[in-house]
Regions:
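Helix-coil boundary/capping segments in enzymes
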Residues: 29-96, 103-106
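Glycine-biased, low-complexity coil/linker segments
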Residues: 335-337
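Active-site loop segments of alpha/beta catalytic cores
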Residues: 1-26, 83-328
Length: 337
């Protein structure tokens, strides 16, 4: 069974012979997936260091991705002269074609990068965009037309290629809940996502959706409108038992050892137990679980913990499910709660 088929079977609950593994940022030869994204236009020249094609400027102060420090859409008047990037510009999908030319037998994930809501907040500014959702809905819809229009054109081009899934990355949660009211999300964003997911499915591809934070209130919505894979890097925040009870068997989960604590400060035994716990709870005998591995040194993950995570997830392919109870965590040192 090829690596591509193993991932497909896990997503479709069709009897994957082992747990597939996605590597995010290193050790790609060990990954069952390969990722590619659209790139800059070939003729794009930033006006200053860190400027994106969208017109905002990235500020990176540490080893994380950083955040925009300027926002081009300062008000409604700024839309008049704003020119978004051309989704069909020369060179836009060159990297995708390069990856596809030597992808071997792996499952190909085409990523849209930062999408939808997050992209809109980068253009307008986070606080201003949230205020506009309540005070100037027409302006919000115009911004979203720009963002989703660009993405829809990129999707149209990507799904004509032999990719297996389109990946959306929109962080919707805080530690406590959704950034906006769930009903507002359903009114403004759900229909736009539904259209995009239908576009992907109509081309015979899978929908892979990443979101950080406590997004529990919209999980059923995402499943209802067509998400095939839900990628969560903080499964403890959502509650693994609860995820399994309410959504197990309905969607494939791609999860990491919880990045907020376990992956960073867990012992070897804790990491191994948690990997098995994720597999046993979120997966089924036919699939439904994909392991996610990322080197998160920027958050304090040691090389030792990274290697333990690798060993733990790869060891799942040698064992049968045991319905492991949730493994306890060692107490945090005083002052780190």
């Amino acid at each position: 069974m090829s690596r591509k088929e193993i991932v497909h079977r896990a997503i479709e609950f069709a009897g994957a012979e082992r747990v597939p593994i996605h590597y995010c940022n290193r050790d790609f030869d060990s990954s069952d997936t390969v990722a590619c994204e659209y790139g800059r236009a070939a003729d794009f020249v930033p006006a200053e260091p860190g400027m994106s094609e969208w017109g905002y400027v990235w500020e990176v102060l540490d080893k994380t991705m950083g955040q925009p420090r300027t926002h081009p859409l300062t008000g409604r008047d700024s839309l008049v002269c704003y020119v978004p990037p051309d989704p069909k510009a020369c060179g836009r999908l060159d990297e995708v074609d390069r990856v596809l030319s030597d992808k071997d037998d792996r499952f190909v994930k085409f990523g849209l990068g930062i999408t939808g809501f997050n992209q809109a907040t980068f253009l307008r500014g986070f606080e201003d965009f949230l205020a506009d959702l309540y005070m100037d809905r027409e302006f919000v819809e115009e911004i979203l037309d720009i963002v989703f229009g660009f993405e829809n054109s990129i999707i149209e081009q990507a799904v004509q290629r032999p990719v297996d899934a389109v990946v959306f990355a929109d962080d919707w949660g805080t530690q406590q809940g959704l950034i906006i009211a769930p009903d507002l999300w359903r009114e403004v964003f759900r229909p736009r996502y539904a259209d995009q997911f239908a576009q992907v499915h109509n081309a015979g591809k899978k929908v892979w959706f990443h979101s950080c934070g406590h997004v529990y209130s919209i999980i059923q919505d995402l499943i209802d409108i067509g998400v095939d894979v839900l990628e969560f890097l903080q499964p403890d925040l959502l509650g693994v038992d609860r995820l399994a009870e309410e959504f197990g068997g309905k969607v494939c989960f791609c999860c990491s050892i919880d990045h907020q604590r376990r992956a960073i400060s867990g012992t070897r035994d804790e990491i191994f137990a948690y990997a098995q716990y994720l597999r046993d709870k979120l997966g089924t005998s036919n699939g439904g679980f994909i392991a996610y591995i990322e080197d998160y040194a920027c958050l304090g993950m040691s090389e030792q913990n990274y290697q333990w995570i690798r060993e733990a997830f790869h060891s799942l392919n040698l064992n049968t499910p045991t319905q492991t109870p949730i493994p306890p965590m060692s107490p945090l040192p005083l002052g780190e709660g």
